């Protein structure tokens, strides 16, 4: 299924038998859940079919998003909570109460949060009070969850990508990439940030915005979600559909130098720069979960076509379907997710892979958790999924079949010994 055409079309590589394939990897701020497992298992199966059955020479690239607002906010939260845990009852109440109130308010003033946390850390004698820095703390957090994600993939039987790219290793190239888009006339600087000029791109004779999602120009709210939780005021934009390429960093946020001032990359430009650096000006396949269709992939496509000033950068887009829990998308924001680690305590990786194979990879899939009450704590916890019964039965047939084949081969003259 090619998302460009929304139909099944014959796949034809751009260059002989070689296939350049880029998929969007995890944003590493928390443990991966079953929705992630379905996404990467599906791509693993598709990749194996392409390379092992059709014998394409596949170059499979995956990125790790290790610069992101979610990571920055989580790093600050973990630091604040760690310092608050050291406060004894009745001590440093003014600072502690002020920090707790800020966290409870939901305000995203990371500069003030960092100031209060540092002051409280100094008061309680925390040894890291003067050393802690968001510039290093966010990356330590990202490294932790990247390692956990890669171990989850290993346990799930997902083959490693041929190349893994990290945003933190590409900041200089991202700056150069953005400058080229500005030089082409499709981006502009505003108050230390840089924005993609959607109207200029849309009005160019050889370009078109909203190729993947025809409603993209109308869905401003979803577009804003793609700007990140720490996005600047929308008044900096010339048009409401414009999106950020480079974010001016505020106090409490990590920052890198650029011609426009200290800041960090926007989400969409990260993939454009990394994919272009590895695969160049034409890409056979770009993939990810269906939630990335818009705004991420739509904007990634526009940026790259602006950079190369070409009509089509990607030949085929493939998107895997959502995994739902009782009809709702599994996500960390909804807090209805089951981690891969927890699922592997209930079922084997092979059983989970069979479960995913029972559903069309590009369609939504629904899971119904089976809960039981813990005898010791009295709390309810998920102990399985109603849909797993068929997958477990299939695995049993699979194991028995190959056990019999193995036995026949041993007894057959000329068979293996």
Please describe what each predicted stretch is.
Residues 111, 311, 319-416:
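Catalytic adenosine-cofactor/nucleotide-binding cores of aminoacyl-tRNA synthetases and other
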Residues 1-316, 386, 404, 409-416:
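NTP-dependent nucleotidyl-transfer catalytic core
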């Amino acid at each position: 299924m090619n998302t460009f055409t929304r139909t099944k079309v014959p796949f034809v590589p751009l260059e002989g038998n070689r296939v350049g394939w880029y998929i969007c990897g995890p944003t590493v701020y928390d443990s991966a859940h079953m929705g992630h497992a379905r996404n990467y298992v599906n791509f693993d199966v598709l990749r194996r079919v392409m390379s092992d059955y059709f014998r394409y020479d596949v170059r499979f690239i995956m990125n790790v998003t290790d610069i992101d607002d979610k990571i920055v906010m989580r790093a600050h939260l973990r630091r604040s909570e760690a310092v608050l845990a050291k406060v004894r009852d009745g001590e440093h109440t003014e600072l502690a109460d002020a920090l707790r109130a800020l966290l409870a308010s939901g305000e995203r003033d990371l500069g003030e949060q960092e100031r209060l946390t540092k002051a409280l850390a100094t008061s309680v004698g925390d040894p890291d009070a003067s050393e802690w820095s968001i510039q290093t703390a966010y990356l330590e957090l990202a490294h932790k969850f990247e390692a956990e994600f890669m171990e989850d993939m290993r346990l799930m039987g997902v083959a490693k990508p041929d190349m893994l790219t990290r945003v933190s290793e590409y900041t200089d190239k991202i700056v150069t990439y953005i400058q080229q888009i500005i030089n082409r006339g499709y981006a502009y600087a505003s108050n230390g940030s840089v924005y993609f000029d959607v109207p200029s791109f849309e009005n160019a004779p050889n370009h078109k915005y909203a190729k993947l999602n025809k409603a993209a120009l109308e869905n401003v709210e979803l577009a804003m979600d793609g700007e990140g939780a720490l996005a600047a005021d929308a008044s900096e934009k010339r048009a409401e559909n414009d999106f950020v390429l480079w974010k001016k960093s505020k106090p409490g946020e990590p920052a890198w130098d650029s011609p426009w001032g200290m800041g960090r990359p926007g989400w969409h430009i990260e993939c454009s720069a990394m994919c272009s650096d590895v695969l160049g000006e034409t890409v056979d396949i770009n993939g990810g979960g269906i939630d990335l269709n818009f705004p991420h992939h739509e904007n990634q496509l526009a940026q790259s076509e602006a950079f190369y000033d070409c009509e089509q950068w990607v030949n085929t887009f493939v998107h895997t379907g959502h995994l739902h829990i009782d009809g709702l998308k599994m996500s960390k924001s909804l807090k209805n997710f089951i981690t891969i680690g927890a699922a592997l305590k209930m079922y084997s990786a092979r059983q989970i892979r069979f479960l995913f194979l029972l559903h069309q990879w590009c369609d939504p899939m629904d899971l119904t958790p089976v809960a039981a009450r813990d005898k010791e704590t009295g709390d309810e916890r998920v102990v399985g999924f109603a849909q797993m019964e068929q997958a477990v039965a299939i695995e049993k047939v699979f194991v028995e079949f190959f056990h019999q084949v193995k036995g026949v081969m041993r007894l057959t003259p000329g068979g293996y010994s």
